[in-house]
Amino acid sequence: KDNRRKGRSMTGKTHSATGFFAGLVISHYTGCPGAMTLAMATGSVLGGLLPDIDNVHSQIGNRLPVVELIVHGCQRGIRLLSGILPRKLRENVRSMTGHRGLLHSLLVPAAMLLALPVIGNTNGIEKAFLIGMIAGNLSHLILDMLSGGVPLLIPFSVARIRVCNFRTGGIMDKLWRLVMYFG
């Protein structure tokens, strides 16, 4: 399903602005030096856009068609293979592979968090980038909880957790983006 047509998705501009803001806030409060702040801010913008990579309208997919091709190919393959599963399990697997599925759960930021110790012996730039990715990703999930909901608890539940239902391009979306740009 394409939630954008229904007006239930935040825009990529809003996600990238909020991710950027989240990265800057974390950088400020952790006292990151200049290069690490840049890495964290860059990671947070990418992290803010990453969950929508499974959407045909994603900013990342539109700029890097090969990434979109790989993601959608994997989705189709999983959906095809799920055809051999019992109906209820098949429906759950298919709901996890569509937009606002697995990539909109807490599994992704948890996996990134688990990767932090692996890159712990680097010069700090990579770590700052990954922390930014986590911040941007979490900001994306929070925003999408305001616009249709997200299945945060996959694989335990595919139920969407929603706080309210702002519309794409609506006044709240635009106002929020303005606050993030100038906040």
Which positions does each model-derived feature cover?
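N-terminal membrane-targeting hydrophobic helices
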Residues: 2-183
